[in-house]
Amino acid sequence: MKIQDKQTSPKFTLDDNGYLVTTAKLARIGAMQYLGEEIGKESGKIYDVHVDPDDLFNDATIKSFENMPVTIEHPTEMYVDANNWQELAVGHISNIRKDESGEFLIGDVVVNSPKAIKIIQDGKIEVSCGYDADLVDADGKIKKANIKGNHLAIVNEGRCGDKCKLGDGKP
């Protein structure tokens, strides 16, 4: 039995099946900026939307991201489901958890698609979660609540910047 990983970089491994395996910071607590039209507010205005630890790290949120598909960019349909996953999914995420710093939601990422692996190896490594959430006005702040995961998109520029990316986070 051959048990040897092939390193593509210090942060990415190709397993014996040719799948890219890594860990990623998926999401973070704190404020992120949204245009008003993205969140049902005044168009053209920028709003800070807060994610509190109790909302990001609760059991329901963590479980909702377990085994969700990985995509290249967010789908135009906005969601991945049983009707479109075959065209959109290039891998999956699992072992979703809070990182040691208490700031990030992290997970293990497996990418199966050779085309997607090449895109990652060429440097596209930021990620953005696709999800549903309620926006709640609380103490003069807009915050996300009831976060329910749908997919993880590999993007050029994610909303939480280069803090959320593939190959970042302890395995």
Regions found by a protein language model. Give the residues of each.
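Short conserved beta-strand and strand-loop elements enriched in small hydrophobics
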Residues: 47-49, 58, 66-83, 127
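Acidic low-complexity intrinsically disordered segments
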Residues: 53, 59-64, 85-87, 125, ...
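Polar/acidic, low-complexity leader/linker segments enriched in S/T/G and N/D
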Residues: 1-63
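Low-complexity, polar-biased intrinsically disordered regions enriched in Pro/Ser/Thr/Gly
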Residues: 34-49, 78-85, 96-99, 137-141
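Short acidic, glycine-rich loop/turn motifs
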Residues: 13-14, 72-76, 137
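Glycine-centered flexibility motif
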Residues: 30-32, 67, 88-91, 151
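Short amphipathic beta-strand and strand-loop transition segments with alternating hydrophobic
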Residues: 8-12, 83-100
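Residue microenvironments linked to proteolytic maturation
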Residues: 91-171
